[in-house]
């Protein structure tokens, strides 16, 4: 995959410059702030019926300050474009191999607006078996059994960063479904200070990429190490939560019996996403800003990244 320059695109109703890092930078930032954008998922607090959310129902806060919401568009119809990478750990055990039919079924059920890519985690890199394509049968054909060699992928977070950095920019939503044990053999685990995990989260946030993660045991000794698998699942939960995605399966006696219910949940989330644009507070320097996207619509909750990389306002 090759990342190109900084093309102008019309996105969410205004002209923006999409950089090679995925930052949305202001072309003519006014006194109201710096235009930025993100993908937000709506979910039901109770039950399965997700309420419809309108722009007037959305609030964006940076700290104690309220930001102006300039656009809120359902990711449907002409705005439904999605690029979805399925990123599989080549060091996974036999459990992942039993899930390939579920993954093929999921891929073949995707709408025409979704392009699916396949990649494998190997030695800290993402080996792309199929670039995102609208030919879902071609994407499904790229699935194969994992190598199943313990340590084949020493850090899933190196691989995630590698995928994110080499993923060409697009006006479509970009999201990842990664299946791995989450164990970072480069760092060793045992706390939440893993710098490679932090870097992967930062890379995904800068690119505006949402990550979904499901635990599947690795091959070899680590596949039945309780404390390693505990921390691996904590890491997966964190990368998903901080990027606005979801993590699946907390267990220590093997992987999930079937991926199907988790894939169905992810599909439901993809079907209830919105394209949000708002004016962030002008800053003198590029930097991270913590944000919170909320709504007061009954039985509705908005899920998004916890922070955004906001470019400095033009001087």
Predicted segments — roles?
Residues 1-6:
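N-terminal secretory signal peptides that target proteins for export/translocation
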Residues 7-9, 148:
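Intrinsically disordered, low-complexity proline-rich regions
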Residues 9-22:
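Bacterial N-terminal signal peptides
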Residues 26-315:
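Scaffold/interface architecture of coatomer-like assemblies
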């Amino acid at each position: 995959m090759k990342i190109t320059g900084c093309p102008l695109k019309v996105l969410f109703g205004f002209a923006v410059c999409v950089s090679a890092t995925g930052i949305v930078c202001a072309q003519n930032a006014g006194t109201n702030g710096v235009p930025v954008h993100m993908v937000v998922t709506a979910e039901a607090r109770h039950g399965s019926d997700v309420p419809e959310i309108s722009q007037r129902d959305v609030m964006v806060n940076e700290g104690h300050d309220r930001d102006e919401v300039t656009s809120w568009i359902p990711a449907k119809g002409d705005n439904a474009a999605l690029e979805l990478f399925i990123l599989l750990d080549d060091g996974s055990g036999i459990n992942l191999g039993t899930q390939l039919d579920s993954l093929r079924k999921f891929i073949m059920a995707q709408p025409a607006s979704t392009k699916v890519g396949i990649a494998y985690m190997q030695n800290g890199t993402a080996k792309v078996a199929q670039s995102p394509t609208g030919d879902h049968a071609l994407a499904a054909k790229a699935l194969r059994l994992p190598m199943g060699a313990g340590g084949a992928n020493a850090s899933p977070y190196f691989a995630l960063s590698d995928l994110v950095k080499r993923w060409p920019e697009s006006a479509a939503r970009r999201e990842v479904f990664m299946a791995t044990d989450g164990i970072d053999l480069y760092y060793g685990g045992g706390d939440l200070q893993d710098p490679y995990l932090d870097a992967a989260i930062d890379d995904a946030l800068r690119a505006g990429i949402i990550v979904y993660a499901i635990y599947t045991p690795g091959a070899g000794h680590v596949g039945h190490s309780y404390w390693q698998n505990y921390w691996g699942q904590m890491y997966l939960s964190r990368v998903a939560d901080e990027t606005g995605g979801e993590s699946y399966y907390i267990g220590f006696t093997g992987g999930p019996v079937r991926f199907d219910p988790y894939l169905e949940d992810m599909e439901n989330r993809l079907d209830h996403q919105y394209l949000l644009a708002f004016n962030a507070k002008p800053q003198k320097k590029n930097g991270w800003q913590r944000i919170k996207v909320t709504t007061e619509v009954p039985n509705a909750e908005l899920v998004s990244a916890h922070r955004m990389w906001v470019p400095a306002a033009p001087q």
